[in-house]
Each structure stands twice: as C-alpha cells, then as structure tokens.
C-alpha cells in the first residue's frame, strides 16, 4: 500500500481506515483531534438525496474514522457546502443525539468556526480545497471548504476575519493546514474561470506563476492552493504556520476521491477537527 507520509503529514492505515494527520497539529493533540479521512472504500457523502443506503454508509464511515481519532461521531457538524464565501460560528450542536448534517441553518455555508469543546467541525471534498485552522492561544478552530469559486471569493480570508471578529484571534497565532485537493498539475480551465481569477488576483506578486497558459491549448493552469497561501499571508498568517500536505487528489486518485477521475457517482473525503 502506498504511503503518502511526508515532512508535513503522516498517513495512517489502521483497522481498515485510512487518514492523514498533520504533524504540526499533532503537537497539540492534548487540545485538539483532527484527521483527513480518505480511501476509495470510504464515502463521507452525507446528503439524504442520495438515499438511505449511501447515507447510512456515510454515518458508519464517520463513526469508524472518529473512533480512530478519539472523537464521538455524534459531535460532527457539517455545512451544506454550496460554493459560497460564508462562514458560520457554531456555538452549540442543534441535534444532541445525532449528527448535524445538511441542516437548514447551514445552507449557503462553506465554513465553520467554534471555540466550544466536543463540536467536531467537518467538511468534505473530491478535488476542492479543505482548510483546517487552529489558534492555540485563543483555542479556536475552523474548517473551510474552498472550491474554485470559494477561492475566488477568498473564503479562507473570511474564515480568518471571522476568527478575529468573533474571538479576537491574532492571525500570527493561527495555524492553517491544507488537505489533499486538485493541484495546478491537473486544474486546467477555460477563459470563463481564468478571466475572473486574473481580474481578482492580478495584483498578486507571482500572478504569472499562479495562472499559466497551457501550451497549444485554449486553457490555463491555476494554482488555487498557492493563491490561498498568498492571500492568507497577506492577512497576517505566518509562512511557517501555513502547512500544506502537498498531495494532489487527481495524482493519487487510487487513494483519494477525485471528481475529475470518478465523474458521476464520485465519493467524498472528509476533514474533521475538534477541540477536546
């Protein structure tokens, strides 16, 4: 079995569960629990629209993953993820005896923050960027889904601003961990995406390295992960506190769900982070 471990992450394969953990966040394992759950035999798709069989399997998969990392799966809260820039502060769970999945209160929401213990913030992806944030000083966490639309709307910056306004977090204290996602090597787009990206980020110093014309094609490669890193540093995060797993979901589609590879019927991975 391929091992994706590197200087920033460890790849755990245990009891039929595969997940990634960030070495930096493991330094605070007495305060937080976290993981990025993966594996093509697991599917963290939580929408009821896919039927009870898919939903019940997802609940079981969440239970298995959460058990491995010391979280009660009932603590999970997940936004509806509609490619918005909206962040919601979770002050308490809505359902005491079951998962807070796809709640009306989390519609038009793609990121969550909290300073409460035993609330496990969850997001899912199949190529989109997921970012887990942690302020060890204020003891605040966030979990953000940033697809290409979310990145264009700077949702990661919105999360930092929400942490500042709600909990007085100092950006220099915030750690941001970037989960597996599609990378520049495979994120190739047409002008309908390239043009708004260039217009939004044209002032970035390295824009010509972040948006690159594909030779002999009417397409462009965009480094959405690189853009997130730069705009997070612009709002005060330290370079050493932005931890990238460096893993492309398409390049590693034998282990990680990828919409571009799986197409219809694609599965989802999940990022989970909880304050103890």
Q: Residue ranges of each PLM-predicted region?
A:
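Active-site microenvironment for binding and transforming phosphate-containing groups
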Residues: 1-276
């Amino acid at each position: 079995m391929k091992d994706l471990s590197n200087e920033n992450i460890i790849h755990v394969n245990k009891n039929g569960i595969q997940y990634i953990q960030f070495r930096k966040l493991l330094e605070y394992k007495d305060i937080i629990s976290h993981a990025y759950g993966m594996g093509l035999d697991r599917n963290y798709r939580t929408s009821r629209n896919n039927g009870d069989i898919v939903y019940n399997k997802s609940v079981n998969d969440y239970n298995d993953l959460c058990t491995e990392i010391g979280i009660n799966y009932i603590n999970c809260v997940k936004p509806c993820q509609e490619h918005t820039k909206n962040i919601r502060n979770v002050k308490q769970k809505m359902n005491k005896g079951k998962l807070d999945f796809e709640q009306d209160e989390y519609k038009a929401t793609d990121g969550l923050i909290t300073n409460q213990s035993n609330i496990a913030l969850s997001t899912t992806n199949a190529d989109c960027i997921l970012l887990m944030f942690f302020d060890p000083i204020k003891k605040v966490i966030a979990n953000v889904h940033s697809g290409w639309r979310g990145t264009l709307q700077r949702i990661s910056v919105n999360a930092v601003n929400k942490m500042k306004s709600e909990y007085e977090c100092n950006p220099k204290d915030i750690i941001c961990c970037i989960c597996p996602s599609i990378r520049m090597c495979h994120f190739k787009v047409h002008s309908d995406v390239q043009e708004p990206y260039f217009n939004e980020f044209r002032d970035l110093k390295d824009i010509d390295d972040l948006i690159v014309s594909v030779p002999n094609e009417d397409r462009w490669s965009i480094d959405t992960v690189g853009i997130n890193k730069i705009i997070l540093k612009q709002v005060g995060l330290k370079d050493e506190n932005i931890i990238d797993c460096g893993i492309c979901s398409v390049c590693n589609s034998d282990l990680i769900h990828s919409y571009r590879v799986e197409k219809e019927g694609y599965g989802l991975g999940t990022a989970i982070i909880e304050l103890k």
